Swiss-Prot record:
This is UPF0375 protein C08F11.12. Residues 1-20 form the signal peptide. GO terms for cellular component: extracellular region. Keywords: Secreted, Signal.
């Protein structure tokens, strides 16, 4: 009976250790930048800032690369993309990007990180 209890205890510890081990390695690399230009328009002092960021996400053998860009102008015109983020994504091994939803590509945590500069 003692060996049965020891065997059950050993198996449960082994199962607990194995189940806690990640099955696929995940790595994340995030960059962010902010650039602003200042100009005079119709006698008004204006600024336009661009918030940009990248996210490289590797899960196992799958790798995606996403680009985030958002322009914010103090005097928006009718052609501007003011306050509308534009995102695109590709495989890490390709340079052919497709437009994607920013929330899906980056998630709220990384969008907040990029925009808080």
């Amino acid at each position: 009976m003692n060996s049965f209890v020891s065997t059950v205890l050993l198996l449960s510890v082994t199962i607990a250790l194995v189940s806690g081990y990640p099955s696929q390695l995940q790595t994340t690399c995030v960059t962010k930048a902010k650039s602003c230009t200042m100009f005079f328009l119709n006698g008004v002092y204006c600024t336009e800032c661009t918030y940009s960021g990248t996210l490289e996400l590797k899960i196992g053998s799958t790798c995606t690369f996403s680009i985030y860009e958002k322009k914010v102008a103090s005097q928006p015109n009718e052609n501007s993309q003011n306050e509308v983020a534009q995102c695109k994504q590709s495989s890490c091994y390709s340079n052919q990007f497709v437009p994607v939803d920013c929330a899906a590509a980056f998630g709220n945590e990384y969008i907040t990180y990029i925009e808080n500069q």
